[in-house]
Structure formats: structure tokens, C-alpha cells
């Protein structure tokens, strides 16, 4: 099946947007739904079935749903996982259609590709916390780790939640975040791309806090959630974090 693609790779589309025309099909395809690619075919036109980002690979085209993925914005705090180590940069999975780029000069002072092996600093699978320095949809987002508290994550645990649930995890004027930190005694860093970094002074508190976070994610739409989370933490921890926070 030969396609005439009329959208750009990684373009944002809406339901009903035409993505491509089928050429040399032999006969007209009146209607065919392709649910795993989130598109359907109507009169030899490939059409988006939802709001998402187009992924074009050769003669294959699909739409990645925006629900559950993160669209970068400048200055956002993000946590990424190193998925590729290059000669001059690392590629980070930031739970987005757009991979994050962390240049070696951000991590290695006086970087020289002839001297420095990037794997000696960050390797595949490492977690990194940083900020979106540049992003304009014409290029992959550039990550900076220059700043207090940024860089390789070497302690604690990283939990993933849907990016769309992050505002509920923070709460109005930080109410849910303050509840979680005060009652658990843990240090919590919430990244906009749906990763949460926890540093607790014991394993049990970390386990309970993860359960509370998953409860918030599951019931984000429900009223009275703050009180339910408070009761859950009181029951599991018996009185909160006693003000003990890690530096």
C-alpha cells in the first residue's frame, strides 16, 4: 500500500484530520478501522481517530494518543531515563513523542568527544532530573541539568503516574503535595512529565507513599480525595512523618 502523507512526522492532529491518501490501492477502501494505530480509512483516506501526535515511519502511519503522554514546555521540570548514549549527547525517554536531548557539555566540563566516553557519566537506564531548556516542535527538546538539585538520580525511588494526573497530585495551592510530605516525612519531587522522585528514611514509608500516590492517580476525579488519602496515611503510618525530612 503506497501512501501520500500530507502531515509532518510528530504533528499534533485532531479527530477527523486527514493524515494520508492511499495511492495505487487497486480498489477504493470504503471504511476500515485500525484501532491499534488510532486511525481509520475512509474512501482511501487515512484519518485520525483522536487527539494525538502523528508517527510516520516509511509507509506506516499512526497516531500516539495525548492522554498518558507528555508534551514538553520550556522550563518544565522533567525526569528522564537514558535510552541511548551517543558521541556528544544522551537521548532521554521523557514519556513524550519527543525524546529529550542532553548534551555532553551539560554534564562534562570541558567536554571533548575524543577524550570523554559518555557511558562513564550516564549509561542506559540511568534516571536524570533536569529542565526543558529549548523546545519549539521543530527540534527535539533540549534538557539542561545546570541548576540546584538537577543531574543524575543516585538515591531514592522514581514512581510513574499519568502526566494528566500531576495537577491532582499537587492539589490546590499545593494541598495534596503538602499532605503527602508532612505525613510521610519523605522528600517528594514531582516532575511535570509524570515521574515522581521519592526519598524516604525507611523502605516502609516509601512503600506506603507509593500506594498513596497510586490511590490519587486512580481516584483523581473523585470528591473528598484529600481526606481519604489523609486517613489512608494515618492508618498505614500511624501518625505521620514526625517532621523527619531528608536533605
Curated annotation (Swiss-Prot):
Instruction: State where the protein is found.
Output: Cytoplasm
Q: Which Gene3D superfamilies match?
A: 2.40.50.100, K Homology domain, type 1, Nucleic acid-binding proteins
CDD domains given in the database record: KH-I_Rrp4_prokar (cd22524), S1_Rrp4 (cd05789)
Which GO molecular function, any one, fits this protein according to its record?
poly(A) binding
Record-annotated KH domain positions:
154-220
Q: Name one Pfam family in it.
A: KH_6
What is this protein for, i.e. what is its function? Non-catalytic component of the exosome, which is a complex involved in RNA degradation. Increases the RNA binding and the efficiency of RNA degradation. Confers strong poly(A) specificity to the exosome.
Q: What's the domain of life for this entry?
A: Archaea
GO terms classed as biological process: CUT catabolic process; exonucleolytic trimming to generate mature 3'-end of 5.8S rRNA from tricistronic rRNA transcript (SSU-rRNA, 5.8S rRNA, LSU-rRNA); poly(A)-dependent snoRNA 3'-end processing; RNA catabolic process; U4 snRNA 3'-end processing
Q: List the disulfide bonds.
A: none
**Where does the record place the S1 motif domain?**
75-148
Key words of the record? Cytoplasm, Exosome, RNA-binding
Regarding protein family, the annotation reads:
Belongs to the RRP4 family.
**Where, if anywhere, are coiled coils annotated?**
none
NCBIfam families reported for this sequence: PRK04163.1-1 (NF003181)
Quote the SUPFAM superfamilies the UniProt record gives.
Eukaryotic type KH-domain (KH-domain type I) (SSF54791), Nucleic acid-binding proteins (SSF50249), Ribosomal L27 protein-like (SSF110324)
Gene encoding this chain?
rrp4
Cellular component GO terms, alphabetical: cytoplasm; exosome (RNase complex)
Q: What is this protein called?
A: Exosome complex component Rrp4
| Quaternary state and interactors | Component of the archaeal exosome complex. Forms a trimer of Rrp4 and/or Csl4 subunits. The trimer associates with a hexameric ring-like arrangement composed of 3 Rrp41-Rrp42 heterodimers.
Residues of the signal peptide: none
